[in-house]
Every structure is written in C-alpha cells, then in structure tokens.
Amino acid sequence: MAVLLLSISYSPVFAEETDDTGWVTENSNTYYTVNGKRVKGWRKIDKKYYYFDTNYILQKNKIVDSKKKGYYYVDRSGVRVTAPEIKYAVSFVMKNSSPKDSRSKRLRDCFEALCKYQYYRGWLDNDISAVSISAYAKYMFQNHRGNCYRYASSLAYIARVLGYDSRVVAGGVTAYAYNNLSPHGWCEVKTENTWKMCDCSMQNAHRDRNLFLVTRKAYPFRLRCDKAFTMNIKGGKVTWK
C-alpha cells in the first residue's frame, strides 16, 4: 500500500490579515480591528471613546492626543474620561509640565505650581467627604485659591491623570509642639507601592520643609489620619470611596 505524504506549511495570520472586527491582544498590546485592519486615533466602540497611537496600540492611564485636537485622559481600560475635574487637571498638567519629562518630574512641577495658588480660609467647612471632593477640586482649578481640602482634592486629580493612584486624606495636624491638632486634609500618591503625602497647604506655610512625596512616618509635623478617600475610575466614570 502506498502512502501519500503531504507537506503542509502554516504561515501566521495577523489581525490585519483577517476579516474580523474586534479587540486583539498581541505581545501585551491591545488593538482594535475593523474588517481586519487596525485602527488608530480616536475610535467610538460600544458608546465609549478609545485612543490608538500611530502604532495602532490602545493607550491607557495617560494623557493622549495633541494640542491641536485637544488633550484627554484615558483610564486604565483605555476609555476617555470627560468629568470636568479630570479635564481641568489635564489642562493644568499640560500648562505646568513638559510631556518630555518623567512622570515624577511632571508631578513635582505640578505640585510646585499648585502651591503658588493662594491659601484661602473663606469657608466654614472643616471636613471633607467623598461627595465633596470633586466640587473642591473644581473650585481650586477655577479660582486658583482654596484651603487644605481644595489643594488636596485638585492634586489628587492631577496625580491621577499623570497615571498615579491617588487619594485624599482627612485628619489633623499642627506644626507646634503643644498646640492641639487642627482639621487638615492632604493628598497621597502611590509610588513604588507606597502611599506618600503631598501636602500643598502646609508646604505653603513651611517653605523650608519638603512635603512632597513623604511618608507619614517622615512627615515633620504631628499628624493624625482619620479617613481616606481613594479615586476610582471605571468605564470612564470617576467615583470616590
């Protein structure tokens, strides 16, 4: 009996060579194809907007696009976030830092720029809640002045659009040994798996100290932490918990 041997070779089929429409993941990068061709720029998919760079790669957790077309923040799933406070934060970052610099350098530049805003105690509020953070941040971005809670809230948005996890913390503080702790709020940013403080309002009052990205243990003043609110963004929507 004669056996006929057939030599069959398989060549790899890439996403752009198929007729499929949908998401494709290759080498840890995410793409979207329409009729087998990868897309770039903005794309509306299932009522949400996503941004693909010139290499067709989905961009995540960063500021994207251009000065001409406008800058936007996209969350960790790549969805464009349109909350007003996020838009203000993006504008602040683009105005006060350079895209050519490292993320940490940009955060530092933005921290210093925010510290130049006027400290203003024109409110009776001595506390902060999850529902008030967005309004506090919006006020600071619009009016360029605020108290400790407004500094903290706006910086939390700034840190997030730069790709950091961020939260707003409320408690008490004093720079004087025998004084009672005064109500206080500050921002914390997660870097190298550690939450670190960024305290704009106290930095304004104590220019000789470094209150940028310091641990609570290294913070030079007496401090009490009562509660923390972490920013969460999912599907383009911002919530605080």
Predicted regions, residues:
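Active-site nucleophilic cysteine motif
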Residues: 106, 110, 144-159
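Extracellular adhesion/carbohydrate-binding repeat motifs centered on closely spaced tryptophans
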Residues: 2-88, 126, 177-188, 192, ...
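Repeated polar recognition positions within modular binding domains
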Residues: 112, 116-124, 141-143, 180-183, ...
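Active-site rim recognition segments
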Residues: 127, 135-139, 189-241
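Short, solvent-exposed alpha-helical surface patches in non-cytosolic proteins
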Residues: 49, 71, 112-113, 154
